[in-house]
Structure formats: C-alpha cells, structure tokens
C-alpha cells in the first residue's frame, strides 16, 4: 500500500509519477524500497487518469435518511391520540359537572 500512497502523494502534489520520485517518497518515509515493485507500479499507472480513477472509486454515501423519516411520523400520531384522550376526559368531567351543578 505504501507504493500506492506514494503515487497518490506525488499526484496530489502535481508531480510526475516516476520511478525516482516514488523511490524518493518511500525512502523519505523510511520504507525499504523494492525496485521491482516500483517499476511495476509506474508501468501500471502509465496512461491512467488518476483523477478519474479516484472519482470512480469513490462510493456515494447510502441514503440512510429514509428510515429516519418513519419514526418522525409516529410521535405525531401519539400526540393526536393523547389530545383525543384529554378531550374525552375533559368532556367527561364537564358532563359530571352538569349532573351535580
């Protein structure tokens, strides 16, 4: 992975990804450099549009808001039921008051 990170670092810095540049980054990071891996990486990245590859690899965040919307409706229904119970209790109290009033 260090080799890929080195190439991404060079790309984000606007530098050309060459064998010498990758070796320099890896050496600066204290990584023991394998020439064959560096050559393979540079050869594999030749002609690749890294920006396009990053955009394609980036996965959009799944819409998790849809399940959250359903619980928001439930408290509204509970409030309506509570109001109905309060109205029924108030009506019953008023009716009893009329009996004794």
Curated annotation (Swiss-Prot):
- Look up the record and report any one GO term of the cellular component aspect: ribosome
InterPro entries the record matches? P1/P2_N_sf, Ribosomal_P1/P2, Ribosomal_P1_arc
What are the UniProt keywords, alphabetically?
A: Ribonucleoprotein, Ribosomal protein
| Pfam families in the cross-refs | Ribosomal_60s
Question: For bias kind Basic and acidic residues, which ranges apply?
Answer: 73-87
The GO biological-process annotations, alphabetized, read as: translational elongation
Tell whether Ribonucleoprotein is among the UniProt keywords: yes
The region called Disordered is annotated at 65-89
GO MF term set? structural constituent of ribosome
Quaternary arrangement and interactors, per the entry? Part of the 50S ribosomal subunit. Homodimer, it forms part of the ribosomal stalk which helps the ribosome interact with GTP-bound translation factors. Forms a heptameric uL10/P0(P1)2(P1)2(P1)2 complex, where uL10/P0 forms an elongated spine to which the P1 dimers bind in a sequential fashion.
**HAMAP family assigned to the protein according to its UniProt record, in alphabetical order:** Ribosomal_L12_arch
Role, per record: Forms part of the ribosomal stalk, playing a central role in the interaction of the ribosome with GTP-bound translation factors.
| NCBIfam families the record matches | ribo_P1_arch
By sequence similarity, the record places it as follows:
Belongs to the eukaryotic ribosomal protein P1/P2 family.
What's the protein name?
Answer: Large ribosomal subunit protein P1
Task: Specify the species.
Answer: Methanothermococcus thermolithotrophicus
Q: Tell me the name of the encoding gene.
A: rpl12
